[in-house]
Amino acid sequence: MAGDVTDVLDGITSTLPSGGERRPGQEEMARAVDRAIRRGRNLVVQAGTGTGKSLGYLVPAALSGRTVVVATATKALQDQLADKDLPRIVDSMPPGEAPTFAVLKGRSNYLCLQRAAEVGPGGRQPELAPPDGIEAGAGAPGNEVLPGHEQLELLGIGEPDPGAGRAGAGRAGAGRAGAGAGATADRRMPGADDGGTRSLPSSGLGRTATSSDAFGIGGQGIGGQGIGGQVRRILDWARTTETGDRAELSFEPTPTAWAAVSISARDCPGAFRCPSGNQCFAERARARAAESDIIVVNTHLYGAHLASGGAVLPPHDVVVFDEAHEVEAVMTDSLGSEVGSGRIRALATQARSLLPSSADRDADAVLEAATALDAALGPWAGRRVPPGDLAPDNQDALAVAVQRALRRVERLVDALRASGDRDGRGRDGSGRDDPDGDARARRDRTVLAGGHLVDDLNHLTAIGDDEVAWVDDAGRSPTLRVSPIEVGPILAESLWPERTAILTSATVPPGLAHRLGLPPDDTDEIDVGSPFDYEHHALLYVAADLPDRRSPQAEGAIADTMAALIEAAGGRTLALFTSWRAMHAAAEAVRERIPFTLLVQGDLPKPALTEAFRSDPETCLFATMGFWQGVDVPGRSLSLVTIDRIPFPRPDDPVLQARRDRAGPSAFRTVDLPRAATLLAQGVGRLVRTSSDRGVVAVLDSRLAKAGYRKELLGILPPMRRTTSLADATSFLAGLD
């Protein structure tokens, strides 16, 4: 088999634009992955930039005869796998031997035909305000109210999708007719082929929605700018789409607009209980993936799979985590839960539309509980909540508010269930006829969502010693969140014993295997290096002579150094910062001192900003944490990367605080240092993206030259030449032309 792996790999690389140059690191990785899969051993692979690590694991996966799930942290990598790498593998193999593949998204990335029917003309969804953290409309007419919006927290919780972003991303039809089985991307479910344009359910979507009154929005969403206009455009698209994949839309709907016509897997009652279930886009996607050999998903989706007890993805033998340095953070987030007042209010509002007026008091009681919870959470904003403070016998304000919300939500859910029993599930709560089953479907969804809310509220009252609770105040109103302190024990029980795992990244954080709970006796670790000539093509400059950051002279000295470096580079600079304040201060100080265009994060959306930087070789881009990873600007547009300081994690991060408490005296080296080293390496890695790239990385933090822990940080960086001389750095840059 190892020989087959090398032969197939050679056949694929010979067709690449690079002309088929052999990559020893890629071949070493492919052989190691092949051995790991055949022997059932876990493997952690550090594969530096330029290795071609995706083919290094996809080729042995394709030849293994096993069902393999590949989990990635970014949409860009998913697109690369589905649009380039997997089709190349399919084309290189004989018909009948090539693997089929699908790229899966979460259920909420697909149009829900039932919700679309309810929100369309003749639909019965109530008008609800948007949830916590979601703006109602950015001031555009028609944005004030969302028809039938059960609120994003209620519908989408537990299915985050950073790879796609809240604005949705991913791609449809990834794969290949025939051998490569088309699919969907990025978040959740697989599917079966439908083979034609679909018609919508009979609840009114068969005709064009032209009046805002049809949506219960007194609104003008002219040109699709308002929420009403966006929903109308989505419903128009719904009549012609074959996949229901949000990525097919010709515009980017707001989270609120898309939430009106979608649903998360957690809150979907299932196709067999849904009037539109036999036409469900998400179920078809899931069936298609179940028939595929290789399934590409978002890492958050894999976390949701684990959190659900394995109910999300099809059975599989092997899981590959690309961008493995993200796994710990993603799993920490995915295996947690959260409760906010917006989620509670949404449940009450939706329930009110389903219950007879005699039950309004139950909905009102839940709304009152939501307001009380908001008030109780306020003093805790941004702080950890000790587990005992939420116990049922605690009489503090927060514990009392949680208990009150729990009791009242339970009562409301019981009323909904009883209403369904009385109606014989054929009429809605007001006694109106329900021939299409729309009211029943809404009640089923609301009961399910209410049950999940009860579960999460119960969880809050019984937080274990291995969990951390805190109040997140980043949204419109505070939210109580719970996460595991360490994910290793959970993964050691629920994941690693079940299937072979391959974890790979250009930067594998120190101690990653241990923190993820990988069994040492069944796990191998290798580093296949990088084919790039860092020693001759790149220089690491550490500004050892800069004054201490607390000094009044620090900002001026940093600006002087940056201006000198940028001048020597002829622009072509990506300046990375650890805070918005530092970024704006540096931009203001440097802008008038350089004769080059200076772009600042926030001037444009990230894709447009990156493209503007890439297209003009004399442009500088100043950016914060969102640009430390995943930004690829090869060639002459980038010759200098500056990093304002070592990117240590925030001291007030609740999960990391809990980990520090647990680690005791070793907290800095076991908690903070590995994360700083990984992010520093990611930032440094923005410079050399191809074998011909050259330039300087300038770290404007003297601690990298003087601190006792500098060796741990330097040891994870590519083997560049190093200097503490500004003259050496400017001379290197000047010599690039």
Task: List the predicted regions and their residue ranges.
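Conserved helicase motor "Helicase C" RecA-like lobe of SF1/SF2 P-loop NTPases
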Residues: 578-602
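Conserved pre-motif I regulatory segment
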Residues: 2-44
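Signature of the SF2 helicase/ATPase Hel1-core->accessory helical subdomain module
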Residues: 63, 76-79, 87, 265-410, ...
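A substrate-engagement module of RecA-like helicase motors
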Residues: 2-13, 66-67, 72-293, 425-432
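Conserved RecA-like ASCE P-loop NTPase motor core of nucleic-acid helicases/translocases
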Residues: 68-74, 503, 572-578, 699-700
